[in-house]
A protein has these predicted regions:
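Histone-fold modules and their flanking histone-like tails across chromatin and transcription assemblies
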Residues: 1-42, 90-110
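Short alpha-helical "recognition helix" segments of helix-turn-helix
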Residues: 47-48
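C-terminal engagement/docking regions of AAA+ P-loop ATPases
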Residues: 51, 60-63, 67-110
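Helical mechanochemical/support elements of P-loop NTPase systems and associated helical scaffolds
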Residues: 18, 58-61
Length: 110
């Protein structure tokens, strides 16, 4: 499974502006898990630069994507991805961390 397949499995589709941003950031976090500690200083600006948009746009569209996932996904699968039971909507950083970690556990380190 890759990042795109995972997002689609979580009820997120390619019509959301944040979809491509999320795929890009998940790949960055898979390569460097510590990147989630620099979400506003590294991940958002790097993603914004890559897509030619503002950091604020990346953050806002990620929030929408995470909210969509929270309201549309199969919660049991979302908990499996997170590795724990989620009682509330994850933050953007937590979402990126848990999806990248899930993909690493699935044997997709690249």
């Amino acid at each position: 499974m890759d990042a795109e397949q995972l997002l689609r499995s979580l009820g997120i589709n390619g019509t959301l502006k944040g979809f491509r941003y999320a795929i890009y950031m998940i790949e960055l976090v898979k390569q460097d898990p510590a990147a989630t500690t620099l979400i506003t200083k590294y991940l958002y600006p790097e993603t914004a630069k890559h897509f030619g948009v503002s950091s604020g746009s990346v953050e806002r569209n990620m929030r929408t994507l995470v909210r969509t996932c929270w309201t549309r996904s199969d919660r049991a699968f979302l908990d499996e991805v997170a590795g724990v039971h989620l009682n509330c909507q994850p933050s953007n950083g937590m979402f990126l961390d848990m999806t990248a970690a899930f993909l690493r556990r699935q044997g997709n380190p690249d």
